[in-house]
Amino acid sequence: HKATLEEALGSKEAITLLAEQAGDMVAYLLATEDQHLKGDLIVLRLAVRPAFQGQGYGSILIAALKDLAVQKEKKAIWIDCSEDLLSYFAQQGFRDEAESDRGVHMVWERK
């Protein structure tokens, strides 16, 4: 069972991280705690406005989520991504775990 966006937004486990520049939101990350994965974190959305892509906002949000995972003593962060984003998430410390119906299932594990 995967958390849907609607379930996550209505959940007390929802995590929303925002990146702003000059008061405007330029990127956001939405994640949730998945009770079926021992409370690991699941990234549901990571979006950066096109004009701000390639400037490190996504990486900053992922780093903040990793810090939060460590603080909350979570073992892992999971994300499903498309093939064209594999190298991006690999650079962020995620590894390819399996193919899924939503792309490639990737995981970052706390050390």
Residue ranges: model-predicted function:
Residues 69-81:
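Conserved GNAT acetyl-CoA-binding A-motif
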